Amino acid sequence: MKEKEDYFYLLIFSLMIFLDRIAKIYAHGCNFLFCIVHSKNYGAAFGILQNATLFLIIAAAILLPVILFFFLKAKSKLLKIALTLIAAGTVGNLIDRLFYKYVMDIISINFLSFNHFNIADLSNTVGAILLVIFLVKSKK
C-alpha cells in the first residue's frame, strides 16, 4: 500500500474519533434542524441490546482486528474507506463504553422521531452504507 494512502486512511480514522470526542464534550444547543443533547445509551444503535455493555465491548474487541485484517487485504479504495469509517465509529463508541459504561448520544434531529445518535454512530452508518455499495458493485 502506498504511504500517502496510509496517511489518508489514518487521517480519516483519527478525524472521526476526534470529532466524536469533541462533539461529546463541548457541543450543546439547538437550531431548526437538530438539537445537541446529552443522552446515555446503555445499548447499541437504535436502542437494541440495552444493558449489554460487556458484550458490546467484547464484540468491538473482536471486530476491530477483523476490520484491520480485511483493510490490509483490500484493494478497493471504497472498501478501505468503508472499513476505516466503521473502525473509527467502533473505537469512538468503545472509548465511551470503557470510560463511562455507556455511549453518549448527542444528536437529536428535530423533524424525525428517531433515537439520539453521535458522530461515531454516523461514521458506522456511512461506513456500512459504503460497504453495502462495495458489495453490490463487486457482485456485478
Identify the role of each PLM range.
Residues 1-140:
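Alpha-helical transmembrane bundles and membrane-interface segments of multipass inner-membrane proteins
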